[in-house]
Amino acid sequence: MDTVKNYLSVAFFAFWGGLARYGLTEAFSFYGTVIANLLGCFLLAFLTYFFLRKSNSRAWLTTGLGTGFVGAFTTFSSFNLDAFKLLLGGQNFGALLYFTGTIAAGFLFAWAGKQAANFAAGKLLERG
């Protein structure tokens, strides 16, 4: 039963994650990919560390939000395609800056997500 619940949770949240990414891409074009990936780094780290600190977290919710929503929201393939398009357009430095800058910023956003999760979980634990 838990396996079915996990699959349904992933499917449900992936639908919303995909719609959110599509909306960002429509609204911000090229920058939508960057925004989605950096927010995804923050969200995945936040969710992971937040639910690790909560003793009563539900596996189906963690799986659905992490694998489903964040997995559908972020896009490694579009990130690489955008960098490749910059290279093909003769923007070698721009491609290098985009690629390395996004990776470095992703680490920073993941760190910030972990810090925010620890803070939020700590506040919840204080309240009891």
Curated annotation (Swiss-Prot):
It comes from the Bacteria. It holds the Pfam family CRCB. GO terms for cellular component: plasma membrane. GO terms for molecular function: fluoride channel activity; metal ion binding. It catalyses: fluoride(in) = fluoride(out). Na(+) binds at G71, T74. Na(+) is not transported, but it plays an essential structural role and its presence is essential for fluoride channel function. This is Fluoride-specific ion channel FluC 1. It comes from Lactobacillus delbrueckii subsp. bulgaricus (strain ATCC 11842 / DSM 20081 / BCRC 10696 / JCM 1002 / NBRC 13953 / NCIMB 11778 / NCTC 12712 / WDCM 00102 / Lb 14). The lineage of its organism: Bacteria, Bacillati, Bacillota, Bacilli, Lactobacillales. The gene is fluC1.
